[in-house]
């Protein structure tokens, strides 16, 4: 990973978020979400067992993570929430506020 400050970094991993909730088999899970800067903005990726889900590019990290959660919900994941755990190489010590996402009807 580059040691450039995030504001100067053109592409690559810029943040790691944590996503947790309940999978389609009704089991609790948590995984790391990798947020990358791309030429078009930000994209995110998460892997869960054999499933890999990626967002499209968005202008904000919040929109990117939200799309990723919505895609997981489309596969049957519920009670989802996320928070940032790393900004660049800096660990946020689990002090960031959780963002809860409403389940789909």
Residue spans of the language-model regions?
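Feature targets compositionally biased, intrinsically disordered low-complexity regions
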Residues: 11, 20, 40, 55, ...
């Amino acid at each position: 990973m580059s040691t450039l400050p995030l504001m100067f970094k053109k592409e690559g991993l810029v943040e790691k978020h944590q996503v947790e909730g309940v999978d389609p088999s009704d089991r609790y899970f948590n995984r790391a979400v990798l947020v990358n800067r791309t030429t078009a903005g930000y994209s995110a990726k998460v892997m869960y067992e054999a499933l890999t889900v990626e967002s499209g590019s968005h202008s904000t990290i919040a929109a990117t993570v939200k799309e990723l959660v919505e895609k997981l919900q489309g596969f049957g994941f519920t009670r989802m929430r996320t928070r940032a755990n790393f900004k660049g190489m800096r660990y946020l010590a689990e002090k960031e506020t959780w963002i809860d996402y409403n389940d789909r009807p």
